């Protein structure tokens, strides 16, 4: 996989805009980037997170009461910490600030609960071409995907629900990477499409149905999409 950015992004959905913004900016201390309109009463509030982006997607209308995704937490590396600091956002999503380098976390680590660790190992190493750094730990750039818990994870027909719902990997060629992942055994979560002249994106799904956005941003790759 040819990366356009060496950091994974993480997306969540919430109906609690003001409370979430206060938490991520004041409690966690993430710098605010900007707000983008996604349509359908959805606004994306982007925050810098060690080169990654925390995407707090605020929904104007009530979100469907879906089962939680398999994304159960995020660890954020921070200089100057003596130990880990567990936190929870206003919807109960787990966040832990960790000393930089703790268990190999240099940027962020996205924590998963999985039904089948072997299926996830095949997916992350073969379909997604991430590097296995140790058992249940996979590196993409300076970000980690970590198998932290074992099942159960319930698939949902709809993916826009409360809590952590997807990760994003920024690539040079969305179509080529999407087709390559499917050819290597990944499953589609949404065919490539354009968002104006700024982004081409698609979705694939991990073995438990968690969505991964394959994003090609003109601001990172240059030129036309």
Residue ranges: model-predicted function:
Residues 1-34, 46-134, 138-190, 194, ...:
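Glyoxalase I/VOC metalloenzyme domain signal
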Residues 42, 199:
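Short coil/loop residues immediately preceding or within conserved phosphate-binding loops
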Residues 38-39, 195-196:
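Conserved beta-strand edge residues that scaffold enzyme active sites
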């Amino acid at each position: 996989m040819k990366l356009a950015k060496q950091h994974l992004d993480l997306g969540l959905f919430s109906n609690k805009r003001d409370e979430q913004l206060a938490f991520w900016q004041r409690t966690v201390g993430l710098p605010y980037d900007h707000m983008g309109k996604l349509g359908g009463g959805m606004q994306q509030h982007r925050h810098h997170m060690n080169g990654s982006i925390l995407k707090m997607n605020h929904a104007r209308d009530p979100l469907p009461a879906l089962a939680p995704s398999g994304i159960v937490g995020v660890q954020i590396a921070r200089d100057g910490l003596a130990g880990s600091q567990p936190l929870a956002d206003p919807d109960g999503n787990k966040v832990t600030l960790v000393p930089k380098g703790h268990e190999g976390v240099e940027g962020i680590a996205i924590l998963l609960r999985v039904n089948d660790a072997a299926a996830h190992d095949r997916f992350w190493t073969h379909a997604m071409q991430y590097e296995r750094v140790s058992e249940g730990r996979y590196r993409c750039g300076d970000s980690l995907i970590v198998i932290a818990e074992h099942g159960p994870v319930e698939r949902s027909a709809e993916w826009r629900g409360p809590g952590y719902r997807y990760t994003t990997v920024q690539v040079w060629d969305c179509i080529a990477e999407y087709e390559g992942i499917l050819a290597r055994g990944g499953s589609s979560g949404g065919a490539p499409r354009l968002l104006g002249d700024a982004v081409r994106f698609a979705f694939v799904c991990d073995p438990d149905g968690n969505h991964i956005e394959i994003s090609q941003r003109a601001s990172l790759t240059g030129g036309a999409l």
